[in-house]
Every structure is written in C-alpha cells, then in structure tokens.
C-alpha cells in the first residue's frame, strides 16, 4: 500500500513539473514578442527623429548634430501640439445645417450693452438707430448717468448702475455685477454682453445659441490673446497662487447659458463679483473667465463670429458680413479699423459702417436707400 501511495505522489509531482515548465515556456515566448514590439516602436520613433534632423540639416552636418536638431524639432512639435490641444473648442458656425438642440427666439436672450454717459450721443444713438431698433425687448443698456432722452427711447431698459464713469477695472466690474444680477432677475435663457461699439446680428446669434441647451454649461466668445492669461490669485493671509485661464474679450461680446450663470452665483451675485475681481486684480471680462474656467472648470467655447476693435476688421470678407454675430470699429495700427464693404453710405457718412451693415441685413429700414448694390 505504501508503494502505491509513493507511486501516486511521484506521478503527481511529474505532472506538476510538466505544467510548470509549459507555463514558463509560454511566458518566455510572450515576453520575447513584447520586447520585439517595443524595439520596433523605438526604431520607428528614432527614425522619425532622425528624419526630422535630416530634413533640417545640411549634407555636411555631423550625425550628432542631426540627432540634436531632430530631438529639438520633435519636442517643439510636441509643445505646439499641446498648446493647440489646450485652446478653447470651436463653436459650430451659426449657419450650420444641424438640427437645433433647443428652439429659442431672440426673446430668450438678455443682451447687455455696457456704455458710459459721455458716449450716449456719439456711440449709443448709432446703435439705437440700427440693431437695437429691431431688438428693443431683448436689449438692456447699462450706463453710469441719468439720461432722460435715452429713457424716452428705451424706457426701463436704460439702467443707471451708479458706478463710476472711470474706465478702471473697479468701474467696469461694478457695471458687470449689475448686468449679471439683472440677467438672473430676468429669467431669460442666455446672457450676452457687448460694448457700445458693437453691432449685434441677432439672427445669427439665435442660430448659434440654438446649438446648445441653455441648461448646459456654455461660455461662448472669442479670446483676444493667443494663450491663456496669467494672473495671481490672492488667497488671504498674504498668500497667493498663480492661475491661468482663457477669457472671451468683452470688446467682441460673449454669451453665457443660464445653467452656467446660476453656478457662478457665489462669486458673481450681489457684491461678490467685485470682490472676485479684486482677488485677481483684472477687469470685468477677465474676471468672468476666471470664475468660469479657473473656479468652475468650464472651458471657453471659441467662436470666430464675434469681432472686436482689437482685431483687423478688414479681414472680414464682404460676402461673409451677414454671417457674423458681432462687428466693431475703431483704430488698428494707427489706421481706421472698419468693415471694408461697399454700402449704402460713404465712409464720411457712415464712418463705423454700421448703417451700411444694417441696410444690408434689413433693406426695408425706412432710412436705407432703395436698391443698393453691395
């Protein structure tokens, strides 16, 4: 019986040994395949680097120099790629054929126009005669002084913020704080801010915003910088930390969904907006970007359909004017910066070109000359 038991033990040990050897053989083969694959990938990467070096050096250069240049070009390319990846996502064009995410009308939009009393006649009257005349119900003018003539034209939508008339970050942030609170009170779906040197095409604005549910976190506009802005956040107790974020320039206009605006409340409602602006010591539009991107972690959605006087407006094609959402005017590199278009009026009669743009979009306007060729 003892012999039988020993025989069984020997058989079991032999079987286990064979199984173990088989597993080790399989593992060895698998590791060899992985190593070969890694070697192939390394060779492909090295060839890519070498090709970069070869393409950028002369025939007489040393191999070591080629490799250095190859690595330098490779990592420069990586840096550019990362920078591109960090840029805000692009909004679809307003004329997209995709079905709207939400059916909205101009009445769902709260358009805030920031101005100052000294520009009521020179800038604001032009807007009242053009695009605001078609959008009285949607437009609210935020200024810093009483104006009975303005009230006669737009009634309670002329809002005296009682903020300073200075063009300081505190005064600008004061007006933005009032804009935000009035929007929340309105119950409208979208908040859009523009300046008193912007023409707003509400038709294309409605088309763009209809691509997104107003309950979704949306921050849409155009940066004036080609990189995130760098700032210092003051944390209290003399502690500070660096922050960087994208922001949409207020000079081109930007829009915020109601869903996102409500989330901004702890940092924007009441007097909180001005306190937040002081934390980073930057103007109103930068503070909006700080709250949305740096605090709430929502990315800016870039749209090329918004335009400010900070860009070369001559580059806006005449044939594309009707597709834009906002336009502007001013000076660029010491030259008149306006939309370059043949319109209903001469440049002397219409230096901003807003009247000509308006007659292009609304030829039935009583003061527009009939049958104008654009």
Swiss-Prot record:
Manganese is the most effective. Can also use cobalt with lower efficiency. Has some activity with magnesium and calcium, but not zinc. Its EC number is 2.4.1.222. Its cofactor is Mn(2+); Co(2+). It is an enzyme of class 2 (transferase). Glycans are attached at residues 40, 162. The active site is at 285. One of its GO terms (molecular function) is metal ion binding. Gene3D superfamilies: 3.90.550.50. Disulfide bonds join 163-174, 192-255, 359-368. Mn(2+) binds at residues 197, 309. It catalyses: 3-O-(alpha-L-fucosyl)-L-threonyl-[EGF-like domain protein] + UDP-N-acetyl-alpha-D-glucosamine = 3-O-(N-acetyl-beta-D-glucosaminyl-(1->3)-alpha-L-fucosyl)-L-threonyl-[EGF-like domain protein] + UDP + H(+); 3-O-(alpha-L-fucosyl)-L-seryl-[EGF-like domain protein] + UDP-N-acetyl-alpha-D-glucosamine = 3-O-(N-acetyl-beta-D-glucosaminyl-(1->3)-alpha-L-fucosyl)-L-seryl-[EGF-like domain protein] + UDP + H(+). It comes from the Eukaryota. Keywords: Developmental protein, Differentiation, Disulfide bond, Glycoprotein, Glycosyltransferase, Golgi apparatus, Manganese, Membrane, Metal-binding, Neurogenesis, Notch signaling pathway, Signal-anchor, Transferase, Transmembrane, Transmembrane helix. Its main location: Golgi. Substrate binds at residues 123, 196. One of its GO terms (cellular component) is Golgi membrane. Residues 80-100 are annotated as: Disordered. One of its GO terms (biological process) is regulation of Notch signaling pathway. Coiled coil: none annotated. Belongs to the glycosyltransferase 31 family. This is Beta-1,3-N-acetylglucosaminyltransferase lunatic fringe. It comes from Danio rerio (Zebrafish).
């Amino acid at each position: 019986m003892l012999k039988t038991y020993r025989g069984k033990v020997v058989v079991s040990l032999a079987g286990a040994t064979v199984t173990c050897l088989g597993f080790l053989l399989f593992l060895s083969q698998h590791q060899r395949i992985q190593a070969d694959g890694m070697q192939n990938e390394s060779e492909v990467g090295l060839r890519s680097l070498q090709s970069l070096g070869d393409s950028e050096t002369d025939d007489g250069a040393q191999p070591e120099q080629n490799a250095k240049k190859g690595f330098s070009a490779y990592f420069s390319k990586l840096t550019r790629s990362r920078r591109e990846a960090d840029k805000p996502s692009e909004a679809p064009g307003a004329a997209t054929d995709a079905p709207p995410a939400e059916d909205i009308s101009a009445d769902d939009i709260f358009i805030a126009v920031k101005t100052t009393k000294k520009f009521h006649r020179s800038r604001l009257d032009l807007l009242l005669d053009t695009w605001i005349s078609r959008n009285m119900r949607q437009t609210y003018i935020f200024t810093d002084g009483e104006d009975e003539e303005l009230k006669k034209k737009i009634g309670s939508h002329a809002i005296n913020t009682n903020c300073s008339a200075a063009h300081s970050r505190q005064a600008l942030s004061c007006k933005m704080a009032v804009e935000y609170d009035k929007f929340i009170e309105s119950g409208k779906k979208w908040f859009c801010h523009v300046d008193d040197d912007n023409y707003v095409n509400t038709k294309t604005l409605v088309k763009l915003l209809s691509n997104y549910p107003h309950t979704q976190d949306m921050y849409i506009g155009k940066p004036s910088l080609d990189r995130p802005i760098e700032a210092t956040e003051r944390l209290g107790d003399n502690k500070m930390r660096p922050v960087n974020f994208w922001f949409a320039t207020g000079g081109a206009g930007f829009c915020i969904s109601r869903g996102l605006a409500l989330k901004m409340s702890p940092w924007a409602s009441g007097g909180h907006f001005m306190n937040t602006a002081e934390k980073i010591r930057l103007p109103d539009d930068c503070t909006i970007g700080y709250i949305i991107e740096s605090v709430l972690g929502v990315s800016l959605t870039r749209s090329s359909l918004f335009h400010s006087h900070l860009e070369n407006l001559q580059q806006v094609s005449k044939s594309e004017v009707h597709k834009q959402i906002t336009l502007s005017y001013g000076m660029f590199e010491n030259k008149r910066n306006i939309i370059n278009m043949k319109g209903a009026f001469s440049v002397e009669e219409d230096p901003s070109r807003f009247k000509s743009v308006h007659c292009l979009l609304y030829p039935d306007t009583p003061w527009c000359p009939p049958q104008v060729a654009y």
